[in-house]
Design a protein with these regions (language model features):
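Active-site-proximal region of nucleotide-activated glycan assembly enzymes
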Residues: 128-189
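Conserved nucleotide-sugar donor-binding subdomain of glycosyltransferases
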Residues: 72-108, 115-116
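Short, polar loop motifs at secondary-structure junctions
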Residues: 37-43, 113-116, 174-179, 236-245
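Donor-nucleotide binding loops and adjacent catalytic segments primarily
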Residues: 191-268
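A short, glycine/small-residue-rich beta-strand->loop->alpha-helix junction that serves as a flexible
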Residues: 7-19
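A donor-sugar binding/catalytic signature common to diverse glycosyltransferases
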Residues: 109-112, 264-304
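Leloir-type glycosyltransferase catalytic cores
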Residues: 163-168, 314-332
């Protein structure tokens, strides 16, 4: 079977899932003939993906999300304005996607939550069937729990999710745990897509806490938590750290962002502190490491992940770096 990928390039989650499925399909004897990755003028295809993906990678413009530069909070209004301003190049992108599909004639297009896919199939109707994969399709499941209130964010999330999957033959909803399918919504619930690099790790019972610190305010909160609990060993992977290891004191060390090293540390830690991105929480759960999930401000999707993760028993959630809450959650 010849497969063409279409991937949202925002963040690491969907790209990482695509790498995982690429590995699985190759091992099963199928041919992944290429990947179309949605990018913006400010964001190209990440090197970690292009270096690991063995088939041709084609970047195509797609409107991106807008985040507050200081707080990293999602800005829905600015995101909408940006999408309106880029309507003309977006239409060109849809025609590019349609032409690539019709020229390469794969047996199936697999769409990892990229709006280019849903809109191309809605407006230009390629002849090749499309299957969509993402945790976000759990939003169409009757058992999926959302934050109370926040009507605007809930509707925006569902509309955005629907725009990615117009014309799809089936929606594969990645889930923390086993759930029944939703045939009326074309939703089939499937396990998370984990990279071979994760499944090959051999976890041990560690004593240190591991934190992935990308939000600007999270490092400040980590330092405050460290002052309150100086006896707890913590390792923090921080986007502002340039050295592999930057020791603060005997129980706190910061590390430069390094995906391979982070996984190695995860396999040896006691628990992790991270944003509520689906992929990292799933990797921690697979390795038996409870998570303190801290959703990004105004990021409705991550707020949903945090609620769903707590329901599935993979960790606990907080709006801040609440070390006491994580300690109380850990088995005694």
């Amino acid at each position: 079977m010849r497969v063409l990928f279409l991937i949202q390039g925002e963040g690491r989650g969907h790209l990482t899932q695509a790498l995982s499925l690429h590995q699985m399909l190759k091992q099963a004897g199928h041919d992944v003939i290429g990947a179309i990755v949605g990018v913006t003028a400010e964001r190209d295809v990440p090197a970690f993906f292009s270096s690991a993906f063995t088939a041709p990678v084609t970047p195509i413009f797609s409107p991106g999300l807008v985040y507050n530069a200081k707080t990293n909070a999602l800005e829905p209004f600015k995101t909408t304005l940006k999408a309106i301003r880029t309507m003309r190049p977006f239409w060109r992108s849809l025609k590019q996607v349609r032409n690539m599909i019709e020229t390469q004639q794969p047996d199936v297009v697999v769409n990892f939550y990229e709006m280019l896919g849903g809109m191309t199939y809605a407006l230009l109707r390629p002849s090749v069937p499309m299957v969509c994969i993402a945790h976000q399709y759990m939003a169409f499941h009757t058992n999926f729990q959302c934050p109370k209130g926040q009507w605007f964010y809930r509707q925006a999330f569902k509309i955005n999710t629907r725009l990615t999957c117009f014309g799809a033959n089936e929606l594969l909803a990645l889930s923390f745990d086993k759930q029944p399918d939703e045939p009326s919504q074309r939703v089939r619930v499937v396990p998370p897509l984990l990279r071979q690099e994760v499944t090959e790790l051999k976890p041990i019972e560690g004593h240190s806490l591991l934190a992935y610190v990308t939000q600007p305010g999270l490092k400040v909160e980590l330092l405050k938590a460290h002052e309150q609990h100086p006896g707890i060993h913590m390792d923090g992977f921080h986007s502002g750290t340039t050295l592999p290891d930057q020791k603060v004191d005997d129980t706190l060390t910061f590390h430069a962002i390094d995906g391979k090293r982070f996984l190695e540390f995860m396999a040896q830690c006691k628990a992790i502190v991270t944003t509520a991105g689906f992929e990292s929480v799933c990797e921690a759960a697979y390795l038996g490491k409870p998570a303190l999930m801290i959703p990004q401000a105004n990021h409705y999707e991550q707020a949903c992940n945090a609620i769903d993760g707590q329901r599935a028993g993979v960790g606990t959630a907080s709006s801040r770096f609440d070390l006491d809450k994580l300690i109380d959650y850990l088995p005694k």
